[in-house]
Regions:
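Short, surface-exposed interaction patches in beta-rich subdomains
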Residues: 79, 90-175
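Acidic (Asp/Glu) and glycine-rich low-complexity loops/linkers
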Residues: 1-63, 67-83, 91-98, 110-112, ...
């Protein structure tokens, strides 16, 4: 539309070949674009990217049972902001000097790449696997029954509560 946003949705009912909607029906849209700085997925949907992307700032907001698979290297030159809620899932390779993650519900985050400064909250029954995502400086809160695994190089501030479990590799200074 006129604000530079692409909205994809189903308006009304779609009848498939077998004349009824069922759980096996899938609808696919293939889109080619040159820039991407904001992704918002809600409900039961999936986004797969192919190739490398570069942007100044990237915001990803996944909710419901949405899924995003990054099939190349995604470079956010200034800031990366990821919010996952519900049973959402994000997997791929991302790089940014500054990253903020808010993972809640039963969501899953699995990243490769790296960041310099990272703030993270992992709660509920969520999982964050950042063992292949080196972080120079991490400030993290892990709560509920969440699980998080990090690779930290320089400094770490880590707080856990409830039945949460957090592990890290590296030899950072504990703040």
């Amino acid at each position: 539309d006129s604000d530079g946003k692409l909205h994809i949705y189903i308006d009304g009912k779609i009848t498939t070949k077998n004349k009824r909607n069922n759980d096996d029906d899938r609808f696919t849209a293939e889109i080619t674009f040159t820039s991407l700085d904001n992704v918002e997925l809600t409900g039961v949907c999936k986004l797969e990217t192919i190739g490398d992307f570069m942007t100044a700032k990237l915001k990803v907001d996944l909710s419901g049972a949405s899924k995003m698979l990054v099939g190349g290297d995604f470079l956010a030159k200034e800031k990366l902001n990821i919010e996952l809620s519900g049973a959402s899932n994000l997997k791929g390779q991302m790089t940014s000097p500054e990253s903020t993650f808010d993972i809640s519900g039963a969501s899953n985050l699995s990243l490769k790449g790296n960041t310099v400064h990272c703030k993270m909250e992992v709660s509920g029954a969520s999982k964050a696997n950042l063992e292949d995502f080196p972080i120079n400086e991490l400030k993290a809160e892990v709560s509920g029954a969440a699980k998080a695994h990090f690779q930290v190089k320089e400094k770490i501030s880590l707080h856990t509560s409830g039945a949460a479990k957090a592990t890290y590799s590296g030899d950072p200074i504990i703040l």
